[in-house]
């Protein structure tokens, strides 16, 4: 008989379907954590992937066999220049019981960030003269009154923030990336005051995260293009020649003639998928690039010129890709202090 006599686990994960290209290069998280903090703060930040290196540090994981000893740790370097909040969005529950935007307030100070007109061209019409700027204030002044009058209905606030890629010459672009970041902690009134205070001002990553804490990483993986079932689903390659002569890097059958089941491995897009990696520890946050730049710079990136962070292990995405950093939604452990680093590799990455 030609049928197989032994069962095997299905290939691929149904939780990762559909395996298609991401619609956006910098995705916004779908879930935000609830933090117990009396003071409001942003729950996320945006950085750009530089590359990987390694450090030696004192292991401070409790109950670890190497606790208190020096260990080798691979790290990922991200360049994180300050971000600028441009607008405040208020969300309230609609008739369907789902949170939805009720209004959006833009501060006049947001227009000082001129690079935003490269992304939102309609804002350039408010920069022509003083009269156009006055129209801008009149248009969005009523939005702020609407937010204050509906404060009891509002579920949460989010800030529309812009990155500053102009400060990173290695990226070779000036158009900022826009993303929404939710405000957590404190009461609604305190969150509103916090948002109005930071609109149009630079926010550093030190205002959001601290060394030693766990965060989640949201981004888009490396694109691999069109791939077969062997690489895409890790299907076992069929025997060659003495078993059949119709190919080996394929599946034996796609199923009955009435139609192919959705769980049957088939070739298609591999990579450039939106993914989330949980509980990545921040090893270090530094302002001096000389502490991390290797001899000759990072391959396919160059040298770091702004504030940087070191994350434990590897993360998704290619070099120069924007990565969203979020407060951990389910941290496995809460560290009180930052790890002690004894050595940072600064040798050339070019071989």
Swiss-Prot record:
Q: Quick check: keyword Ribosomal protein in the entry? A: yes
**Molecular function terms in GO for this entry?**
rRNA binding; structural constituent of ribosome
Which Pfam families does the UniProt entry name for this protein?
Ribosomal_L3
InterPro entries associated with the record: L3_arc_euk (IPR045077), Ribosomal_L3_dom_3_arc_sf (IPR044892), Ribosomal_uL3 (IPR000597), Ribosomal_uL3_arc (IPR019928), Ribosomal_uL3_CS (IPR019926), Transl_B-barrel_sf (IPR009000)
Which terms under GO biological process does the entry name? translation
Q: What residue spans carry the region label Disordered?
A: 1-31, 246-271
Query: What keywords are assigned to this protein?
Result: Ribonucleoprotein, Ribosomal protein, RNA-binding, rRNA-binding
> Which GO terms of the cellular component aspect does the record hold?
cytosolic large ribosomal subunit
**Gene3D superfamilies tied to this protein:** 3.30.1430.10, Ribosomal protein L3, domain 3, Translation factors
Its family remark reads: Belongs to the universal ribosomal protein uL3 family.
Q: How does it assemble?
A: Part of the 50S ribosomal subunit. Forms a cluster with proteins L14 and L24e.
The protein's job, in short, is: One of the primary rRNA binding proteins, it binds directly near the 3'-end of the 23S rRNA, where it nucleates assembly of the 50S subunit.
Q: What is this protein called?
A: Large ribosomal subunit protein uL3
Its lineage opens with:
Archaea, Thermoproteota, Thermoprotei, Sulfolobales, Sulfolobaceae
């Amino acid at each position: 008989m030609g049928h197989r006599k032994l069962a095997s686990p299905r290939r691929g994960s149904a939780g990762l379907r559909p395996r298609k290209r991401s619609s956006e290069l910098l995705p916004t998280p779908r879930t935000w954590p609830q933090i117990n903090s009396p003071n409001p703060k942003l729950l996320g930040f945006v950085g750009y992937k530089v590359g990987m290196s390694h450090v030696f540090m004192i292991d401070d994981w409790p109950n670890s066999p190497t606790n208190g000893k020096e260990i080798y740790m691979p790290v990922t370097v991200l360049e994180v220049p300050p971000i600028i909040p441009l607008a405040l969005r208020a969300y309230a529950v609609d008739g369907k019981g789902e949170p939805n935007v009720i209004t959006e307030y833009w501060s006049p100070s947001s227009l000082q960030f001129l690079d935003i007109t490269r992304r939102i061209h309609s804002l350039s019409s408010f920069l022509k003269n003083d009269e156009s700027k006055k129209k801008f204030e009149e248009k969005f002044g009523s939005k702020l009154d609407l937010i204050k009058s509906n404060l009891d209905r509002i579920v949460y606030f989010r800030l529309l923030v812009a990155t500053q890629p102009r400060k990173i010459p290695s990226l070779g672009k000036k158009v900022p990336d826009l993303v929404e970041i939710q405000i957590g902690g404190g009461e609604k009134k305190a969150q509103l005051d916090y948002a109005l205070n930071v609109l149009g001002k630079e926010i550093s990553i030190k205002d959001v995260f601290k060394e030693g804490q766990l965060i989640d990483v949201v981004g888009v993986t490396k694109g691999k293009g069109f791939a077969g079932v062997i690489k895409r689903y890790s299907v076992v390659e069929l025997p060659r020649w003495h078993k059949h002569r119709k190919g080996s890097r394929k599946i034996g059958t796609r199923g009955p003639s009435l139609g192919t089941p959705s769980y049957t491995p088939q070739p298609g897009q591999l990579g450039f998928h939106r993914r989330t990696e949980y509980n990545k520890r921040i090893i270090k946050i530094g302002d001096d690039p000389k502490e991390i730049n290797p001899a000759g710079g990072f391959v396919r990136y160059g040298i770091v010129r702004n504030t940087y962070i070191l994350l434990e292990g590897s993360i998704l995405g290619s070099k120069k890709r924007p990565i969203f950093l979020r407060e951990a939604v389910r941290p496995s452990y809460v560290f009180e202090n930052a790890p002690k680093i004894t050595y940072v590799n600064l040798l050339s990455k070019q071989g």
